[in-house]
Amino acid sequence: MNPMISKEGVSLMLLSQLPRSLHDWSGALSCAPCWQLTNEALLPAANAHDSAWIVLFGKGLEAGHLARLAQQLDALGLEASLYPAGEQAGIPLLLLGTNRFSPELVQALKAQEWDIDLCHLAALPTLSEPGLLVMDMDSTAIRIECIDEIARLAGVGEQVAAVTAAAMQGKLEFADSLRARVALLEGAPVTILDEVAADMPWMPGLPLMVDILKQAGWKVAIASGGFTRFAGELQRALGLDAIFANELAVEGGLLTGKVSGPIVDAAAKAEALQQLASEYGVVASQTVAVGDGANDLKMMGV
């Protein structure tokens, strides 16, 4: 059954008739290269808006998110064009071009609860100009939380994992949660750090991404609430330009249960991005921050 309908001689796709899964959109929207988004439907368009951008990204991304966004755009008098649906690392992604950048839309999206990632940008970063990528490490650049692995080897895995989960959800101040978790590691042999580092699984595509960015003249760094032992391992292996992470204090070959120096928290991550952008002469529109936890939000909002 063809979900397209005709209204006053114009073919259109009602948002309510879109397949729920983005994987099924290619067939339904194959008759046009891009689509004009209204509050009720998609209309085939020969040309797309590209003055500003909206990106939607997430495992749960579906037609309902686009319909909700359409209502928001209509309320603000914004026009938008939908580009073909895609995915990155197996996660659905939608890209829309708008007729102008709207600070009001930025604030409206921030004020609402969404179960996906989305943002409104004045410009998309490009590989044709110098840029800066700053990544979180644990569960972002790598597939584990290093402190949980250390704790497991030290015999306090369950206690530390519970605090980690609360911290990632923003239920605890990051600095306090880190001190509490590290304190549980007191007396553990420093050699367990080597065990974790030796079996540290990278996110799929990480080396390729870094290589492509470096070839394009981008700078790549890590700003992590994790530890220098592991961030340093990534820096050596991937040729990262900088790392910001916490240093575990050690005495006599044992962890003391404390962190040496200032803690890298949300504010420190944001400062790291700003510092590197200034040092490397990278404009704000060419900076990208990537993270998965509450302590990454300030960095991602720079």
Model features per residue range: what roles?
Residues 125-172:
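Active-site neighborhood of HAD-like aspartate-dependent phosphohydrolases
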Residues 162-166, 178, 209:
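Short coil/turn segments at secondary-structure boundaries
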Residues 180-185, 197:
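Long, charge-rich alpha-helical interaction segments
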